[in-house]
Amino acid sequence: MKIRAAVMREKGGPFRIEEVELDEPREDEVLVRIAGAGLCHTDLAARDQLVPSPFPIVLGHEGSGIVEKIGKRVQKVKPGDHVVLSYVACGACGPCRKGMEHICLNSFEYNFMGARPDGSRTMRKGGEKINGSFFGQSSFATHALANERNTVKVDDDVPIERLGPLGCGIQTGAGGVINALSPKPGSSLAVFGTGGVGMSAILAGVLCGCSRIIAVDVKETRLKAARELGATHVIDPRRSDPI
């Protein structure tokens, strides 16, 4: 099918909106019409070749949208479902079998190399192969092919175009607090940097019952937002000694 995608063709270059051809979903794949996508530093790292993803490539790994088609083996979602797309894991290595997909042994190959695990590309333009499958999605496009494993169904009463960051930034910040730190009620939490990940960590601190949540940043607008989200103290290290 023909879609429009933001194609990155060179290191540090611009995103170019181009018409490309996207495969039909394979038996374990899900075709999603993208409603919204977050822009993460990891996308910019791939653009700048801090991670060696191949060009030309369609980036984007915080996508959300509506399922349009599914492969015959897909059971978790159906056409019309609202979904958030996240990273993809192999599902077969030791960590994956223990439910720890976030440390999948094949994570780099599955998320950064621009192709399906079998090496095939999902997109092309004329006779040119376009690398995709970035984090198992490449959501800087009107449509994305994802795997059933990295497609998460969400309620349809929430604006789907706002949910993309759940796939990376929000789960990174909130998950780091809830699952890794696991703070007890009444404990203190310091968050250095209050971008999307840091703000998510603050929200998780509130959820966990932290009595003191300290936000540290050099931008006054972010510190103001951090207070609104639950930070009890804010520090701008340019204006005061954070120690």
What are the residue ranges of the model-derived segments?
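N-terminal Rossmann-fold NAD(P) dinucleotide-binding loop
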Residues: 198-199
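Glycine-rich beta-strand-centered segment in the early N-terminal region that forms part
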Residues: 23-37, 50-97, 102, 153-157
